[in-house]
Amino acid sequence: MKFSTVGFLFSTILFKSAFAGWMDTHMKDEHHIDKYTDESFFRLHDLGKKGYWSDQDILSLYGLFENDEVPFVKKNEVLVDVLKKCDPSGNRRITLDEFLAFRKNGGELTDFGFPGHHGDEEEEFEMHHVEKYHPAGLDEPDENWNHPEDIEHFQKHDEIFHGDKKPEERRKHFVKYNNIPDKYRRVSI
């Protein structure tokens, strides 16, 4: 049986991606980084540059720190799992040395189904949706901002800025009736 070089490379890529761990997937999807060291992974996720991962760092790594939609029980499950694997001293602080030892022994962070996030919703929308579907950013024509994600995102903005006001109430602020020429004004009957 003969394999071509292209076939071999293709099967290697498929094999690697099928068995890529959560950390690899996270680094590629969240940070657009294909190659990294365990030390660079650790330092990138040590958000306060303290020299250790705190509970906040772990939850942020998984995108759970500012996520109110995930129940406390699930957040706690993630914390317990990561601390159990990476914190042999039991002080709830994972140092670089502890993390490197965990990785050297073949350790892999568990995939809980969360991609991992580092910023607020705006940053995440910008990073994952705008970069992918709107490469021109704000210079993109309005008619291109029509994906379900766009609509949902801008509806949230409307809710934040306008609250429970009805659309008619919101329009009052945008229309300056004094600037409308008489010939275009409605005449009451």
Curated annotation (Swiss-Prot):
It comes from the Eukaryota. Ca(2+) binds at D87, S89, N91, R93, E98. GO terms for molecular function: calcium ion binding. One of its GO terms (cellular component) is endoplasmic reticulum lumen. SUPFAM superfamilies: EF-hand. It is found in: Endoplasmic reticulum lumen; Golgi apparatus lumen. Residues 1-20 form the signal peptide. Keywords: Calcium, Endoplasmic reticulum, Golgi apparatus, Metal-binding, Signal. This is Uncharacterized calcium-binding protein C613.03.
